[in-house]
Amino acid sequence: LKGMPEPLIEDEIRRVLGLVNLSENLDDKIKSFSGGMKQRLAIAQTILNSPEILIFDEPSAGLDPFEREQFKRIMVRLKKDSIIIISTHIVSDIDTITDDLIILNKGSVIANDSPEALFEHIRGMVWDIPKEDIGLLPIENIYYEDTKSKTISKTKPTPNAVISEPTMNDLYFCGQLDGGVFE
């Protein structure tokens, strides 16, 4: 914005604040902003100069569900004009706002495809999750625990059940607990 006439600077600031749903807060003190508003303000600062490539690291971390939905709508709008690279562990962000998904393990690319293709690839896979990691799963994803093989399954009583209809949460939690394969 350096060198831009002041009226144009104000217009650009208003435009960017509008993109992140903060137009009404132009004169508010940042101290009064919620965590989600501060996150959206950070996004606004990032896009102010209309960069061709935007890189975000865990941009929706710490947002409540409502703010996360607002964030997704903002990202969908932004990806029309910019290339967006997002590092995230929040799988609901992936299926909503990404066209391509790259899965890294210790800095190496182990998968690169659309979220839908990768999701289809995991359909029917057996997930063995170490017993010590079971407590990290959301309780609604645990239907059966086999203490002998130290695995969990979605059906009862098969020790190594096949996930026939996995959700993105299955991908996330299984990936989260498999020693970093899907990180």
What are these model-derived regions, one by one?
Residues 70-151:
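ABC transporter nucleotide-binding domain
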Residues 43:
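Hydrophobic anchor residue at the start of the ABC signature
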Residues 29-33:
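Conserved ABC ATPase signature
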Residues 65-67:
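Helix N-cap at the start of a conserved alpha-helix in ABC-type nucleotide-binding domains
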Residues 54-58:
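Catalytic Walker B motif of ABC-type/P-loop ATPase nucleotide-binding domains
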Residues 8-25:
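Conserved ABC ATPase "signature" region
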Residues 140-183:
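C-terminal coupling/interaction segments
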